[in-house]
């Protein structure tokens, strides 16, 4: 997989689930999030990116919305690039 596509394995209890994430998957997830819709996009992200042979095992775990958010959050955190970002302080002096 290249730098933008990632195969990520999460261990949940005694089960391992491998997910294949692409930029398109992550973009679709973020675009689906709304103020009143957070769990369904997470559920969709998990179910569409988990390896086919583990879907049936994963599905019952996603009945708990907190589990959905925890797994999706962990998956996205692992997918995120490791980049150092620094915010520069503004000058207190106004310029004309």
Residue spans for each PLM region:
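Short, surface-exposed, charged amphipathic helix/loop patches that serve as local interaction elements
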Residues: 2-6, 15, 20-96
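Carbohydrate-active enzymes and regulators
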Residues: 9
């Amino acid at each position: 997989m290249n730098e933008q596509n990632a195969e990520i394995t999460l261990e949940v209890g005694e089960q391992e689930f491998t997910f294949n994430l692409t930029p398109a998957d992550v973009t679709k997830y973020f675009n689906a999030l709304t103020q009143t819709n957070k769990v369904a996009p997470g559920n969709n992200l998990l179910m569409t990116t988990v390896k086919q042979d583990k879907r049936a095992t994963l599905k019952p775990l996603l009945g708990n919305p907190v589990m959905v958010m925890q797994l999706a959050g962990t998956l996205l955190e692992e997918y995120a690039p490791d980049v150092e970002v620094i915010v520069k302080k503004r000058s207190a002096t106004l310029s004309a």
